[in-house]
Amino acid sequence: METRKLSSCALAVRVALVLGGALSLPALAADPAPQPAAKATASKDTSDIERIEVTGIRASMKASVNTKRFSNSVVDAITSEDIGKFPDKNVAESLSRITGVSVTRDFGEGEKIAVRGTDPSQNRTLLNGSAVASADWFVLDNPSRAFNFTLLPSNLISSLEVYKSPQADIQEGSLGGTVYLKTFKPMQLDANTLKLSAEEQYSDNSEKWDPQLSGLYSWKNDDETFGFLISLTRQDRTLVREGKESLGFVRQTVDGKDYWAPRVIGDANFEQKRERKTGFAAIQWRPAERWDLNLNILNTKLDANNTNHNLYTFLNDNFNPADAVISGDHIVAGSADNATSQLYVIDRISYSKSKAYDFEGSYDADVFKVTMKAGFTEAEGGTSRDRHYQFSRVMDHVTFDGLNHTDYVDASNTESRDQLLARPFDWMQEGARTMKDEERYGGFDFELPVSHGIFTDIKAGVYYRDHDKSQRQTGTRFHWYKDDQLNGAWGDVLPGQTNWASGVLGQYSLSDFVGGDSTANYPLLDTGKAAAIAYPDAAFASPTATFLFLADTWKVNEKIYSAYTKGNFQGEGFRGDVGVRFVKTEVRSSGYLWDGDATAAAISLLDGYSLLADAVDPSAGGDWNVRQETAKHSYDDILPNLNLVFDLTDDTLLRFSAARVMSRPDYVDIAYHESLNIPTRSGQRGNPNLDPTRANQYDIAYEWYFSDTGMLSGTFFYKDIEGLVKYQNVDAQAYDEQAGENVLVNVTQPINGAGSEVKGVELSYQQEFGNFGILANYTYTDANAKEERDPVTSPGSGLTLGTSKHMANLTGYYENDWLSARLAYNYRTHYYDGISEYGSEVFTDNYGQLDGRIGIKVMENLELTAEAVNITDEDIEQYHIDKSAPSKKYSNGRRFYVGLNYSF
């Protein structure tokens, strides 16, 4: 795609059109040691650090430094001014600037985070101390425990902290660290605080402008006994991701030796329109002097409709050994005969939405304090409509070199663009996938000041969580249309694939679906025109047109009971806390498994879904023969922890922490589901009897605070992890409809493996030099799985997911009375990223991103801003085992923002 540069004229016009605005919400008072439901104590007098006015970068740095310094735990923090000054439109981007925290940016925007060499699903995110349900919009994302940060705009957050060593009063479930987000409270802000922001975003890949709007209003009465806050945000983005990809590697024999060879190579054009709307409301009421009642309501939705055009070449097993170019253990270039080429288009209506209702009430009687917490959160995401279109042809001879390949319209294959347009329609299918996440929770905390020995207060509490995670997948049957070149197997209609109302689809060609111009060497579909032809309303009048994919429909319920006790202590030159958390988890997993009995009776369905009897009876033309199953499992955990801080001097301290932590397995792994591919005799299924991954962890840290905003720190961390989830192959019996008999299928299922050992070092430095300043950090992580490496028979063995050995951040800034500027660079080295579509390993290569922001104060309450994301236009690149075998390369492009911010 030709890169079009943003002209200064266009930029000036956009700035002139932007109206209203407010920056990162308010100058506010912040607690210098914001530990959830805990009082941080220090052995030195801290009475002079009660409240900090966050009015600029330096004040923000001071607040973050104090949070870290006076916490008993190993904590890193960012305040509201940090988030507002960075070019961060969601919280994940802000978190990526903390030591030990990495972020995924599959579509050019931070989505999920990981801490200290762990998987994103092994780290919890809490909003005001409670979970927020989340779901993914992307069809290839499995329901997991990882929080989707694309739902949460950063202007909602007053501060964030990453707890790398646990406290007994913080919810369990994090193996790497717990992200603790705090929103603004009405009593924090001045009465009638108003913040407005209006921006325009330009994406250079899509060459589109999109609006970014937000506003916040906060009020409280003169007595400060009642207040409310309302925040509204809308952020649009037109996304184009251009890519080349290999969907996996398989073993091929050349001259009697096996090598890894690409299975499918393709070009991908992904287009998406994102529209995120978020509403947040907070009510704070103090009905009496000792009471404090808070209600927070969050409602956020992301519409993420997208279309993906793929031009694939299936090399199949027809490699020409004489043409193979070998590099190490890979065939990196060569040719194949009788390959298949496809123009494959997917058009999706995708979304993700979350709601959270959180209530907290406290009564402080001086001699004791009681806090009650209760709430409900729910989320839903996925694709409400997922339409597939395919046009195929057989190619006599193709060549490939890395991710370059002979494509559908290559002239050497004697098919011109006009001939391509005359190709008949191959097949189509429509589906929908809905993922739901719900949690109901409640608990009590009791805090008692004491003066027994070194202890200053004792805290205890109980907590209950009832969590549901489910997935439902529906679809039409596959509909194939005869093409003599496709050798029968693809042209024949199988049982259960008849009676589609639009049975004349075979008369259409690609030219009937094409609309508009394309800069690519192949035409793009007009999806509206294609839908009118392939999916007329009459097609769905047939009662058998749509059915439930039982193998991908399941539900998991967890009931979690926890209790804890914790003591804060302080002595001459030391302080800390010690505690223990007791947790019981009860799991109930329901789903559907294949049944070897071809005459099995009809089944009942989860959550009241209905299903026609012929859908489960092969003799009636049904596709499956299944049975519903429910499994129960439970486990208990005792999680002690110790945080100890020694004040070496007035400016230096030494930390030590030790703890037992746990992380529950991903929902898709414990779901009772089974997905089988009978022709290939392969499949996958879940394992409801998985136990959590557990670890013993230790931290030692040295910290030097040489000024109010200056700090130098070093931390060594170690985790001995046990029970990491791995995958094994087992034989299972299934019914083959075409053969009319039971067959053995090789099924991959998760089990608890040996574990891993993670150790590393975090270094952090920040200092100001007059109006200039610098923030820098570096993380080294060495993660080793406790099993042998075998990428051929056990892909992923001996590897730890998502772990980069080296990560670094460097930020420079300048600030005076009217100008504020920052330039921030984030870097991480390669890491193991999971298993490909064909079961081979995928690694993501080194990646660095440069972002910047400038703010100019044009009036007392008005600021003009300009921001840039991914300034150097970096691509995301992946490979298989070694870099000689590229797997994927994606360009998300750069983004630019111009805007006005107004505060009153």
Predicted segment positions?
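N-terminal periplasmic "start-of-domain" segments of outer-membrane beta-barrel proteins
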Residues: 53-86, 112, 123, 135-137, ...
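Gram-negative outer-membrane beta-barrel transporters
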Residues: 717-721, 725, 730-836, 872
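C-terminal beta-signal and adjacent terminal beta-strands/loops
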Residues: 827-834, 855-904
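Extracytoplasmic beta-strand/coil segments of soluble accessory domains associated
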Residues: 92-134, 164
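Outer-membrane beta-barrel transmembrane strands
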Residues: 183, 198-201, 209-220, 267-308, ...
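Outer-membrane beta-barrel signature, preferentially recognizing the C-terminal barrel domain
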Residues: 346-348, 352-354, 552, 556-559, ...
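Solvent-exposed loop segments that connect transmembrane elements
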Residues: 242-267, 307-345, 390-427, 480-495, ...
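Outer-membrane beta-barrel translocator/receptor signature
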Residues: 139-146, 155-162, 169-252, 260-263, ...
